Amino acid sequence: MTIPEKPQGVIWTDAQWQSIYATGQDVLVAAAAGSGKTAVLVERIIQKILRDGIDVDRLLVVTFTNLSAREMKHRVDQRIQEASIADPANAHLKNQRIKIHQAQISTLHSFCLKLIQQHYDVLNIDPNFRTSSEAENILLLEQTIDEVIEQHYDILDPAFIELTEQLSSDRSDDQFRMIIKQLYFFSVANPNPTNWLDQLVTPYEEEAQQAQLIQLLTDLSKVFITAAYDALNKAYDLFSMMDGVDKHLAVIEDERRLMGRVLEGGFIDIPYLTDHEFGARLPNVTAKIKEANEMMVDALEDAKLQYKKYKSLIDKVKNDYFSREADDLKADMQQLAPRVKYLARIVKDVMSEFNRKKRSKNILDFSDYEHFALQILTNEDGSPSEIAESYRQHFQEILVDEYQDTNRVQEKILSCIKTGDEHNGNLFMVGDVKQSIYKFRQADPSLFIEKYQRFTIDGDGTGRRIDLSQNFRSRKEVLSTTNYIFKHMMDEQVGEVKYDEAAQLYYGAPYDESDHPVNLKVLVEADQEHSDLTGSEQEAHFIVEQVKDILEHQKVYDMKTGSYRSATYKDIVILERSFGQARNLQQAFKNEDIPFHVNSREGYFEQTEVRLVLSFLRAIDNPLQDIYLVGLMRSVIYQFKEDELAQIRILSPNDDYFYQSIVNYINDEAADAILVDKLKMFLSDIQSYQQYSKDHPVYQLIDKFYNDHYVIQYFSGLIGGRGRRANLYGLFNKAIEFENSSFRGLYQFIRFIDELIERGKDFGEENVVGPNDNVVRMMTIHSSKGLEFPFVIYSGLSKDFNKRDLKQPVILNQQFGLGMDYFDVDKEMAFPSLASVAYKAVAEKELVSEEMRLVYVALTRAKEQLYLIGRVKNDKSLLELEQLSISGEHIAVNERLTSPNPFHLIYSILSKHQSASIPDDLKFEKDIAQVEDSSRPNVNISIIYFEDVSTETILDNNEYRSVNQLETMQNGNEDVKAQIKHQLDYQYPYVNDTKKPSKQSVSELKRQYETEESGTSYERVRQYRIGFSTYERPKFLSEQGKRKANEIGTLMHTVMQHLPFKKERISEVELHQYIDGLIDKHIIEADAKKDIRMDEIMTFINSELYSIIAEAEQVYRELPFVVNQALVDQLPQGDEDVSIIQGMIDLIFVKDGVHYFVDYKTDAFNRRRGMTDEEIGTQLKNKYKIQMKYYQNTLQTILNKEVKGYLYFFKFGTLQL
């Protein structure tokens, strides 16, 4: 169908217009970052409805996430409603408003689930199936692998024995089990998993495939050997310019002769390479040689570096690719074939048994969704089924978003329900292969690349390709820098796609013309003499300074109004490859009081509150685990002190378990009686919880622990209380989810948690920060995909690529299969096989390619300005970086494949042709926009030494002044003088705050307000606070005289803390028995009973308030809290006083869903003549109004609910607030 002519004045670019209307064949839209692909996709759907009259439920729209699906459906629904309002008589539009709710705009998994629900009879499964949780799936798969391995241990096939000896250790078979698990996940990402597993052995048996692998390694070796020869020749040329280096030249001449033989005839002579030694040692560069070439010091160093580079490149070929002769590599393949075949058999057994278990439990996982859908849509010969044909008739177009993240199974499903071939099909695909960063989820970017290379711009004879290259997100400096980097870094060899004119980004956003250069910051670490911080901590502190600089100096441009506003916290994001730097950043931002949030799915199990609950669960499951038992004892719940634990252990130093030591201590006559009682209560708790866990699910056990010990309340009152509370509820909810699976019990739940921790999986800290909250954010590049921020700080660039998987004994690859090292069982030695070497080389190339794509995603998140943060150890590392500058179109393939981290790649590109002669002892700034080559982007490269970075002042351009500018300052600059005077005259605006303590009790706040109202200075209250003693009165003073009033008050509060609330009021006799019990338990002293005002307590027991509490649903006693005063005072943003309130609430109860607090008062007061009870009550309320206000606001802040309160005076009665 012909694309309609684009009218004048429409907002769409030509490429977007084509993307909206192109039809009649399969269409692939290569949509670069920020090119408006979502808007185009929505507009295409709308035009299908409005222009072509297609019903919305006859379109299948596939998105990558459920969130994307909801957002897209919402956008489409809005547009339909707008069109319907504009044309109310249009019956077709009215129908669409109804049909939008049945429209298939979803993830492919959701579509597959719907397919299964409608056609379960084809699969012969129970229609009442449910989807298994991740917990259930992990445990069931682990259980299946264990059982299958045990079965094969019974068989003891020779190939199985060899496998276990190769892949297991003397202590465990964890590695063997992990490989089986990985193979399972790789296999089910294919349309026919069994067939994929069967083909794993083919390269080990067929010589033709082995020859292909040899050729692959030979071609790759040629790249490195050619680069090595170039480096060798450069070293020779440099040494030839010098005096006194004849011996050096002789060594290099010999190496050149050897290399010439290897490269003779344009081919790589691998046998000659493996048979001879290369890289002879160069003679030392003596002081005499340096003196003779004193004018060529840099050239001398460069010559040595070039020879070092030559050696490293040759070593890589000889060590990584051809450490053994090709014939030996082939011979090992034949011996490995039975092991590979048997390993595939084990995985097939796991797959079969795992499927059987899932069917018996009537559960499905996400892999089942895809494979069952494929089973419904295909016949046994792989051709589309009748059901597939019906879907082909129903769906008039299939639209796929994020096509670059599709896998082979999903591709097969789409091919079953699409119509026609590529030249006349109805499949519309949108994506950007440069943003394919989900290979760990088995995404296969080659599907996109194959179509991109096959489809044409005009679509003649095949599918149509449309390039959306105009970026509407970023300033031109961000785009030109991104283009410049990737023009030199990415091509088909490394990166898997050519970054040419069609792939690059074109400026399309309506920004003004102001200058916003990209900033590349190179941080040189301070050594231990200059800083106690690690390199990572130094980088974190430096990032904070960059944030402060942005907040003070940068503005955000509003495209709609054409005006600027000040930068805020939420405008800034810090992107990293992983969350490894999160803790350092959190601490650094905390030190500067900058609101900061880590958008993390990691670190959950490291949170204090979560570790406490897990220690509790582990101790209940098995108290013989010392770490968890002692951890629970030392926690805020039980509060055993270190010296108490020492006493216990000293008495039984040879016990195997601390639990045994506790029991022995309790039974020892010489033991401290108070500690024995404390231990008895602790063991009683443990035994009680153990008994409870036998009859109740895990989530109820956790809930009981929370309620018994006020865990939620305690952690809610700490700094970060909202997040801590969310974490605790998150663990509770996970326990509920776990209990809803087919697994039960505390042991299984702990096993599940251990499995997640071992695999590096996290629930993630519960997110309590919304998208509009004004905080600086840190997130991984993966989680930032699809988002945009005015200011992006891309840090962690110097962190090395994670190549851990390349060191495993088994390398997996979707295209090639399985590469296994050869293990000589007799010699117990492992050797690289042809397959393991070749697949490792392929995996390394794919890994670096994906890391490049991650860099692309990170750079293209920035709207206003981009900051790139690299870090080097010292000046020597900086000098080596300078040597990386390139002069060609691309960085050499070998340089890219061996680059340790993104920073090496980025710096080598952006520092191209830059002078390395600036003195190292000066901070400097190199603006590569000033270089004559006009194609260069606008980038500032700054070298910063950490010891020069002040963590108290903001780094600005003054930190990088040239020598001339410094001289001008010395001669006297009026601006500088004015600045100095301004700083000396500066008056600190918050002087009063320096006189206030950072932490105050509620009682102190009450005194503060009372003194302010009476005209007394706060300093006197502060002096009172400092002088007030909280230590207990020594026994010798207690024994000599009566208790003081405040001590009696404390005693009365202690009695009330433990007082039972019964619907049938306790009698005076029972009260005496209860107090005797407190004495027996050493809660109060033996002589305290005489000072307890029994009559006043009985008056309370007979009061209405006692009855109300006795009938309450929940009662909590003596609740401590710590809360930010700004939150309690509900201060506006920016007026927050950094002051913490701490206190203790006597009692809280919940009745009819409402929370009430009670505060007991032992005050003595004089009843003035003629004063009524009402007047006395008003006077008492006024006296404590400040304190009660803080209690009420604190609880409302913590609970997020309305709270009411009571004051109870033992000498007056009840006052309701």
UniProtKB/Swiss-Prot annotation:
GO biological process: double-strand break repair via homologous recombination
Enzymatic reactions: Couples ATP hydrolysis with the unwinding of duplex DNA by translocating in the 3'-5' direction; ATP + H2O = ADP + phosphate + H(+)
Catalytic activity, EC: 3.1.-.-, 5.6.2.4
Keywords (A to Z) from UniProt: ATP-binding, DNA damage, DNA repair, DNA-binding, Exonuclease, Helicase, Hydrolase, Isomerase, Nuclease, Nucleotide-binding
An MF annotation (GO) of this entry: 3'-5' DNA helicase activity
Domain annotation UvrD-like helicase C-terminal: ranges: 476-786
Cross-referenced SUPFAM superfamilies: P-loop containing nucleoside triphosphate hydrolases (SSF52540), Restriction endonuclease-like (SSF52980)
UvrD-like helicase ATP-binding domain: residues covered: 10-475
One GO cellular component term noted in the UniProt record for this chain: cytosol
Chain residues that bind ATP: A31, A32, A33, G34, S35, G36, K37, T38
Cofactors required: Mg(2+)
Protein family (similarity comment): Belongs to the helicase family. AddA subfamily.
PANTHER family reported in the protein's UniProt record: ATP-DEPENDENT HELICASE_NUCLEASE SUBUNIT A (PTHR11070:SF48), UVRD / RECB / PCRA DNA HELICASE FAMILY MEMBER (PTHR11070)
Physiological role: The heterodimer acts as both an ATP-dependent DNA helicase and an ATP-dependent, dual-direction single-stranded exonuclease. Recognizes the chi site generating a DNA molecule suitable for the initiation of homologous recombination. The AddA nuclease domain is required for chi fragment generation; this subunit has the helicase and 3' -> 5' nuclease activities.
Quaternary structure annotation from Swiss-Prot or TrEMBL: Heterodimer of AddA and AddB/RexB.
Protein name as catalogued: ATP-dependent helicase/nuclease subunit A
Source organism (scientific name): Staphylococcus aureus (strain JH9)
